[in-house]
Amino acid sequence: MLGSMALKLRKWIWASIPSLALILSSCSALVASVELKSLSELQNLADRNTELTKNKRTLITTLRESYGLNPKGTLNLLFEGWRYTLLSQRILERWQTEVGRFAKSFGNGSNQNSVQPNATLKGLKLSERSTTEIQLLAEQAITVSKQEVKEFTYKVESNKQFEATVKIKADLKIDPTKAMSHIENIFKDDETKKKDAQNSLTMSMGQNEALEATFTYSPATQGIFGRASFDRFTSNIKLNTKLRIQVSSTSDLMKKLLENSLTSSLKDQSFDNEGVNLFPYTLFALL
């Protein structure tokens, strides 16, 4: 009896080995080390292996393994995905029409403020670099009606030497009634400039105000990018950067605001250790 059972068990084990080997082979293939140097290579791989777009952990693991084989090439790929999503796919303009794709990449409940960079109140970091009066003006009287990425250039030498520059043109709508009291407070120390700004506000009633914002990213002083930056549990590929924001405008009212002593610092400021999650841009580029 026991001998018969042992014989059946041995037969079952031997019969199961091919299936088990196939399963293990398939699992290994999902996270196999593949050297990737460009977005097109990753897109081709994703076409052959749909698990990369179905499972975020699989995609991050694949990218992490690639980084171990070719750090510069993989980092270049991530920057390329970032540029492709912002410039070619125009995510800041189309995020509301690409709802499913956007939510899968950036998470449910995400909006244009989830995209880096952007020219909204949050994207321009006004709460961190302006007076209360400017914040109130922006929050209560100014809305961003349209954003367009005009330029995205980057260069990657290594994880310690890279730079990306993104230029965004934003169309702003200003509510004259809500803005007037804030304009009075901003220019309260200069009656001539206050009247000029009020006249500009009246003249611009109902028109879009143009704003140009340039965001430059370079390595932060702390937190060097490496394999530990690929976190598959939080779906995060964190790039620590030093961020420089430069703002300019060709519209009369915006120029007056930027030239005011209270607001002139908005024209050019830098922030160290600004984190950018490169993962959602890469995933968006594959969907």
Swiss-Prot record:
InterPro entries: Lipoprotein_3 (IPR001595)
UniProt keyword terms in alphabetical order: Signal
Pfam short name (any one): Lipoprotein_3
UniProt signal peptide: 1-31
Highest taxon listed in the record's lineage: Bacteria
Family: Belongs to the MG439/MG440 family.
Identification of the protein by name: Uncharacterized protein MPN_639
